[in-house]
Amino acid sequence: MNDYIRVNCTELRWPELVCAEPGSNSRGHSPPFHIANASITQLKAIDLLFLIDFSISKIMESLLQLETALRAVVEETKRPNAAAAFASLRRADPNNDPALTAVASRVVDLASEVTQLLEPAYLALADHLFGYQHTQCLAAVVELRIPDYLASGPQTFEQLSISSGTRRDRLRQVLRLLYNNGVFSYDAESDSVRNNEASEMLKQDHWTQWHRWASVCSKQFYQMAQGLPRAMSAGVTRSPAQVHYDTDESMFSYLERNGTMVQLRECMGAAAIAQTPGMITGYPWAELSNHTLFDLGGGDGSLIAGLLRAIPTLQGGIMDTPRVLPFLQEAFHHPSSKYADVALRIPPERVIAGDFLQEVIPSEAYVMRWCLHDWNDEQACQILRNIRRSIINSPVSRLIVLESVLADGRWGRMSRLGDINVMVTAEHGQERTETQWRQLAACTGWKVVSITQLPGAWPSAIDMRPVERPENV
């Protein structure tokens, strides 16, 4: 390496770093020096500059390799057979290969890490500051039924604006934001848009009924979240929603009294229906054949009904609050009930009112979906102790908790979004980490034997088995 070097460093008082031959005086700057005469400070600065230059070269090389690999993946998606596989991943089909889903989740998380390293900080802030636009634009296209107008196939903006009765310029602006973020697909050559796996689920007749979330998130949840700053202040016990509405009532009671609970109940019911298939296929419920499974806090009954349909020899029961009981009786035990086909295996005497903070109906097996995240640790422990006291010991005895497990990374973002959602709406609302779930189990007479992420669903199946009952349980 040429040992005549000119250094661009304010402390060293040389204007630039260049390789220079002995005796040269490039650009009229100070003469080159011989490295043998450099001070320790000068040598460290020279070394640092070469390291920076070397690091930039390595980063550039790595990024170019990554770019090549990503382009290859994008090209792969265009092959007919591969396109179907990628579409299945996008739909979160419960029958997808778990190994493929696991690899996809790792790639998504890594891609997100790389994005955070490369993306300018102001763009990261912009996503948060202007995030309301995504919600409101999505709500607008749902209200205008744009996904339904595209049900028969792609349309140009001119065609779509005519069929939907919208302004073409503003329709283009809104859809541009959405299709660049994975909702709808755009073809530049024909200047047309079509439904993709995400926008397809927003159609009014789609079985998941995801469209119901658009209105609730853009209005009710958006309003409730405005109470966050005050609710985060030290000493405040109200939830953000209670702060915003200035009430001590629970959100369910408040919305019921104000006539807006129906919309929220429909929204929650849609979420349950959309995720039930993954909850059924993702855990070995068949191990409970010929036994009775009680759904504690069974809500709309969709989970136990789905399990009874999937396992013909399973018996079922539901315990929920007196307020919910009329809805459950209508769902199972009226001539036109939507779950009438399984009513004989969940008779009226096993659809009961109760309070699991007080006591629980005896059974060999229990399932709880989206219940414990509404309670603080003390209350959750009380519920788990009550179930432990009531469980009938047998080879199949267990409690399956269907709740989110907090996780970092892009793939795990639903657990964090859910964490904020229950915190906003419930006074003690919180999701928990795997460590927290294991601690709750250990101090209430349970052992977590497995935690399984369910396909196409937000929660995991946390399998708890009764252990030797400690004195304090």
Swiss-Prot record:
Keywords on record: Methyltransferase, S-adenosyl-L-methionine, Transferase
Binding site for S-adenosyl-L-methionine: 320, 354-356
Biological process according to GO: methylation; secondary metabolite biosynthetic process
Source species, domain of life: Eukaryota
Family the entry assigns: Belongs to the class I-like SAM-binding methyltransferase superfamily. Cation-independent O-methyltransferase family. COMT subfamily.
Catalytic-site annotation from UniProt: 373 (proton acceptor)
Pathway, per record: Mycotoxin biosynthesis
SUPFAM superfamilies, per the entry: S-adenosyl-L-methionine-dependent methyltransferases, Winged helix' DNA-binding domain
Lineage: Eukaryota, Fungi, Dikarya, Ascomycota, Pezizomycotina
Protein name per Swiss-Prot or TrEMBL: O-methyltransferase aclU
Keyword Disulfide bond tagged: no
Enzyme Commission code: 2.1.1.-
Function: O-methyltransferase; part of the gene cluster that mediates the biosynthesis of aspirochlorine (or antibiotic A30641), an unusual halogenated spiro compound with distinctive antifungal properties due to selective inhibition of protein biosynthesis, and which is also active against bacteria, viruses, and murine tumor cells. The non-ribosomal peptide synthetase (NRPS) aclP is responsible the formation of the diketopiperazine (DKP) core from the condensation of 2 phenylalanine residues.
Keyword Transferase: yes
One of the record's GO molecular function terms: O-methyltransferase activity
Cited InterPro entries: COMT-like, O_MeTrfase_dom, Plant_O-MeTrfase_dimerisation, SAM-dependent_MTases_sf, WH-like_DNA-bd_sf, WH_DNA-bd_sf
Gene3D superfamilies from the UniProt entry: Vaccinia Virus protein VP39, Winged helix-like DNA-binding domain superfamily/Winged helix DNA-binding domain
